[in-house]
Structures are given as C-alpha cells and as structure tokens.
Amino acid sequence: MPESPDAYVNRTYDQTVAVRRSLKRRNSPAASEDGLGWPRRLNLRILAQPCRTSSPLGEDFDYAKEFLSLDLDELARDIDEVLTTSQDWWPADFGHYGPLVLRMAWHFAGTYRIGDGRGGAGAGMLRFAPLNSFPDNRNLDKARRLLWPVKKKYGRKISWSDLMIFAGNRALESMGCRTFGFAGGREDAWEADETYWGPESTWLADERHSGVRDLDQPLAASEMGLIYVDPQGPATLPDPLASARDIRETFRRMGMNDEETVALIAGGHTFGKSHGPTDPSRCLGPEPEGAPLEALGLGWVNSFGTGNGADTVTSGLDGIWTATPTKWDMSFLTTLFAYEWDVALSPAGMWQWVPRNGAGAGTVPDPYDPSRTHAPTMLTTDLALQEDPRYRVIALRFLENPDEFADTFARAWFKLTHIDMGPIQRYLGPLVPTERMIWQDPVPHVDHELADADDVAALKREILGSGLSVSQLVTTAWASASTFRNSDKRGGANGARIRLEPQRSWAVNEPEKLAIVLDRLERIRRRFNDSHRGGKQISAADLIMLGGCAAVEHAAAEAGHPIEVPCRLGRTDAPQEWTDIEWFSALEPTADAFRNYVGEGNRPPPEHLLVDRASQLTLTAPQMTVLLGGLRVLGANHGGSPLGVFTASPGALSNDFFVNLLDVNIEWTPRADTADWTAAYEGRDRRTGEVTWIASRVDLSFASDPVLRAISEVYASADAEEKFVRDFVSAWDKVMNLDLFDRT
C-alpha cells in the first residue's frame, strides 16, 4: 500500500526523493489516473474545456482590451524598482534581482516543446503543480512573490503570464542587454492543465530514454523535474561531450538550432550565480506543494545558516560565472575560453568545473561581502560549448563578434518567450517587433475583396460538379484544418500549407490522392480569380474549406436532413519560402483516429492518441464523438479502410455508426491476423455468425468506455438523426475555423 501523503509533510524535498515518492504516472495525456488498476481507461478530463465561469474575472472579461490600456513604461519603472530594491526576507545577490527574475522567465517559457506544442509561458502554469515544485525551479516561488506588489497594483490589466515574461525582459534590459521586443496576450489559466511531463514516478529519474539516449516523444527535458538537462552531465556524469548531445536534442525539441542554443546558454550564464554552499538534502524543506499550510505556498525553507542571502541553497551547484554577474558583456565567453578547466565537487558534492592550478582566483566578486573574491566556476553544460566541435565554432565566432552575439541572443530570447503564442496576429502591445520570423508561421495579409454569398453558392455547385467525391473533399478539408494545436496555436487551414512541403507529402495525407484533389480545386480557383481580376478573389485555403463544407451539406441532404454549413472566408495562401520544412515537420500526425490512421512507432494506444488530438482541437467529449461518427460514414478513413464504416450508405451523413456499433445483436472479436495497436475486430451476427462489420480499437472504444458509450447512446437513439447532423456541423465548423483568430 502506498504511504499516506501526510507522511511527507515534515520531510525535506531530497529525503522525499530518497524514499521514491510516488508521482502520478501516465504513459500519455489521455491515460487514466484513477489508480484503480484500469490502465486502458481513457482520461477524458483533458477534454473538459476551461470554463470561463471558473475565472474570478467573469465570463465577459476582455483581457486584450485591459492589456492594451496598460502603460508599459510605468510598468517597466515599477519592475525596475523591484529588481534593484533588496528585501530582507530574500536578499538580492549583488543587490540585483535581475538574474533571479531572468531565471524565472527562462524556466517558465523553457518548458515549451515542439513535439506537441505544450509547455511554455502561455497560461501561467508556473504558478501550479507540478511546475511550481519542479526541483529545477527551486526558489522561483520567491521571484513571483517579489513581483506580487506589481501584480497587485495593475490587477487584471496584466496576467501573471505576461508579467513574468515582461519582467524577464526588464531584467535583461536593466542589466544592459538590448531585447528584441515583447508581445502581450497570454491569458492566465486558473488551474493546472493535464500536460504529460514524463513516465517517471520520482523526481530527477530518467525512464524516458531508450536505446542510445533516444528520448521519448513528445518530451524535451532529459529527466523528470528538469527544464532542460542535468547541469552536471547525463546521469550526473561530468562529460561535456555527452552533455552536448543531450543539450542539442533537448534544445532541438524546444525549437532551437545550434546558434540559438549557444547564444541562450552563453547569454543566460552571463548573469547571476548558482547556489550550493551545502547539501540541499540536509537543509531544504518540502517544495511548495508539500509545504505546510502556514507557508502560504512558499517552499524549500532553508535551515542552513540564515536561510537566505549568502546561505541560499538551490541546486547544490555553487559558483559565479563571470566578474560582472549583473552586466551584459562578453565575460562568459571570455572566461570560458581563457582557462583550462578541471572538474571539482561543489560544497554540496556536485560536479562542476574550476580553472586549472588555481587560475582565476580573485577575479569574481562575492554577492554579499565586498572584501571577498572568488575564482569563476563553470558547469558541465557550459564546458559543452567549448568541447563540442559545432558549438565551439559558434561560440568562438560570437566571442570575436559581440554585436552578432548580442543580436542572436536577443532574437533567441524573443523566440523562447514567444514561441508558444502562435501567429503574430495574436500579439498585443506597442513593443511587438515589425519583423516577421519564419517560426511564427507567417501568412500574407488579405489584399483583395472576398467572395460574396452568391459567389460562394456558385463555387459550391462547381466543386460538387467537379467529379470530386464527398470523401475526397471532406478528407482534404479535414487534413488541412485538423493540424491545429491549441497548445501553441500552430497549424490549421490558414496558409493552405497542405499544398506545400512537408504537409503534402505526409503519409497520413495520402500524397497521390491529395494531389488529385488539390489540382482540381486549383483549376476552379484560377477560373474564379481570372474572371474577377482586380476584384474578388478566393484563396486556396478558403476553397479547400469551402469544398469540405459543400460536401458535408451534400451528405446531410443525402441523409434527409438538409442544412447550411457555414464557411467563414478570409484565409490566405503562404508561399513555400515562408514555410520551414523542419519546423513544420513537428506537426505531422503519427496517428489520426478521426481518419482511422495509426503510423509506426506510437507507444500509447490509438484511442488515447484520439483523446489527445481532440484536446488539441479544443473538442469536448460529445464533439469528438459526433465528429468521429460522422467522418466514418462520410468515408474519411485513411486508405479507404472499411474499419468503422458501419453504414450501407457511405457518403450520407447519418447516425449509422452509432446505431450499428451499439447493436446488441452484434458480437465483437479480435482478428488474429492483426497487431495490437492496429488490431481489427470483427462484428458477427449473433444468430448467423456472419461478419457484418469490422472495426478498429478506436471505433470500439465508443461502446467500451462508459463515458463515450453514454454519449454514443444519445446519437444512436431513434430521435437523434437531426440532432446528430446539427451537432456534427457545429463541431465541424469549430475545427475548420480554429486558426482564424479574432485579434488583429
């Protein structure tokens, strides 16, 4: 039996780790957390959309309006005062909180990963568990408390998310670093989300690597509870080259290339110090989530010495990188290449590096005692920039070109802190840079008159008469729009990047079949645009959506329930040169249960991947259910697979999927010739034994999972045909428009 959580209240953080404190363990975001021994149960809680009524700001609160009324100059002055006013309860190293606040913003934004777009600074998750209690985030709770007077003053005008990033910018600027810009627009969440942080059951454990350091997708950090990699080296081994391999993989999964990686590490470690005058396991109390009630959310109470200031204990590493730890300059790179380095133990017994033969003594100031000096200290991850051949070339180039280093750092910092915000039309405020970066997935502005209602009706008729089937039109529209990820607001139909590499060649999109549809739609588009030169035009992005909507309308009419499917216009077409192939490859679906597609290499079951994908599309459980059932009867399966097509009238938008799935006269058994995750099941007539239908795991989950079955029963009922069509159209319209943001 697991120990009671109460048993940990009076243990230090590291004592808790030593007894292998159990964390909630999942293999995917959609795996159950009930702990009752039902590992196949779906976690549908991730489909519970944030309810605006749970926000104390009310349903009608308009954050964009509030933020745009904010005086950023006044805010900057207030933050600067916080940064340079040391507090007795948590004294500032070197009299400046800049390095601490910079680390807070860095670790906040640095959780972002390209694999699923989760993490990042977008919703203020650093305030909640587990991030607020990550071992890598020790003492960042103090940084947030230092900013509370500022947050209190401005209230709803600035979210915690925006404030922490803006404060990080001001920290840099107050120490002499010119930043690239700042965009507001990050709205706070009011509770922790369901992000999957790894399979481990203990902090600082590593069960996410297999083979030769192959890191599980979609994770980026090398261990549970780290933001990046172990600063001592992989598995605490002080090997700079091995560390470089981990750094390169982790930063690549954060969306950073080698130049950006070197700039961020070298620039970040230009400031501040590490804190380890003694072993953290001997003096630190519980993390914020395990701290006693009277701590009011602060954790890691330190019993060593005064408990703060010169006696602050954070990681256990201990040292100062440069002679000017609160000033932007070239001192980190100068120091790194000025000495030969030997590995040594910190006072806490952790591996770090010092200049050989006592060199550098007396060159680094003490943060509190002006009469004391020290030698500089480096981490294994710092030495990686010197030892790795590719990093070394970049670092030496930066050393010889300070302006290039400063510009690369400023741009990389802006990318790090804004990468999860999505397209630039979501950015707010006067400090937004005018330059467009390719990682922002830019699309052209609308520079033409849009088609009107008569044009749309005529185009629908032409599309339906083009020889393209309902299945082809629906599948293409779905393939274009369903790439959207709510986590980082990437993907979607705007830009029509389904026409471009890499999307047009993704296996899930069946490139040869896709090319036929795109070619035929392009001919229709050209005819329309040529007939309206200088006037109304339609983009490929809009026409693809219009084709899907026309097909759904036709299918609904075929089922006896005619309905108008709305189609919002205003998308534009991105050129190939605005599309970074490697950057967009992160959006490629390894599975799409809505199309009954399962690629190779997926560890979670496909029904779990379905729920995860639905959460990225902001779908509720009923919306996910009605969409999948409708797409099955519309023939949207990958490769024309018959799995789950429970209808005698494919192409008609009927509720047949649910009616036949819940037919009590059908008995389901797995087919012996299929593998586990791609298993097929045969539905046999109980009386005759004849195979009536075949299904995938995903299909059967809508009758097996109790929640999904309850929803399916609604749509299988005799009075549900019209409701099914209405609900399908509503959910379809939602997905088609996810990337059309209202902000301008």
From Swiss-Prot:
Coiled coil ranges: none
EC number: 1.11.1.21
Cofactor binding note of this UniProt entry: Binds 1 heme b (iron(II)-protoporphyrin IX) group per dimer.
SUPFAM superfamilies: Heme-dependent peroxidases
Site positions per UniProt: Transition state stabilizer: R103
Gene Ontology biological process terms in this record: cellular response to hydrogen peroxide; hydrogen peroxide catabolic process
Catalytic activity: H2O2 + AH2 = A + 2 H2O; 2 H2O2 = O2 + 2 H2O
PTM comment text: Formation of the three residue Trp-Tyr-Met cross-link is important for the catalase, but not the peroxidase activity of the enzyme.
Catalytic residues (positions): H107 (proton acceptor)
Name of the protein in its database record: Catalase-peroxidase 3
Gene it is expressed from: katG3
Location of cross-link Tryptophyl-tyrosyl-methioninium (Trp-Tyr) (with M-254): W106-Y228
GO annotation, cellular component aspect: cytosol
Record note on quaternary structure: Homodimer or homotetramer.
InterPro entries attached to this UniProt entry: Catalase_peroxidase, Haem_peroxidase, Haem_peroxidase_sf, Peroxidases_AS, Peroxidases_heam-ligand_BS
Name of the top EC class for this enzyme: oxidoreductase
UniProt cross-link Tryptophyl-tyrosyl-methioninium (Tyr-Met) (with W-106), position: Y228-M254
Binding site for heme b: H269
A GO molecular-function descriptor: metal ion binding
Co-factor(s): heme b
Keyword vocabulary terms for this entry: Heme, Hydrogen peroxide, Iron, Metal-binding, Oxidoreductase, Peroxidase
Assigned protein family: Belongs to the peroxidase family. Peroxidase/catalase subfamily.
Organism encoding this protein: Mycolicibacterium smegmatis (strain ATCC 700084 / mc(2)155)
HAMAP family: Catal_peroxid
Summary of the function given for this chain in its UniProt record: Bifunctional enzyme with both catalase and broad-spectrum peroxidase activity.
UniProt-listed Pfam families: peroxidase
